Amino acid sequence: MKVSVVGFTVAGLVFAGSAMAVDMPPVAKAKCAACHAIDTRVVGPAWKDVAAKYKGKAGAKKTLITHITSGGSFGWKLGMMPPRGLGASDKEIASLAQFILKLK
């Protein structure tokens, strides 16, 4: 009986944690998720790491938009991001930059 209670408690915590987790915007899932994740480095850096790198810096959103638009490595030493990821529009890039910078 104790095992069942512990199992249900752990399962409940897992589901509660996933419900509270930040979800990647649909455009990011479609055009960025092959190389990026919110919490984990994949091919490119985790977006929370990107947010931390630019936190409190003047012009952070503009810089991030420029990086996403032009492509490159940006000092991450993880490889080269292609320009515009997988064909994101200017509006999608601006929205994505805003999303990334709000991550904690």
Predicted regions and their residues:
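N-terminal export/targeting leaders of redox proteins
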Residues: 1-23, 104
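Electrostatic cytochrome c docking/interface patches
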Residues: 15-28, 53-57
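Hydrophobic alpha-helical segments typical of transmembrane helices
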Residues: 22-23, 31, 46, 64, ...
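Stable alpha-helical elements in mature extracytoplasmic
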Residues: 23, 60, 64, 89-96
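The canonical Cys-X-X-Cys-His
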Residues: 31-38, 96
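Protein kinase-like catalytic domain
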Residues: 36, 69, 101-104
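Axial heme c-ligation environment in periplasmic c-type cytochrome domains
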Residues: 42-54, 70-95
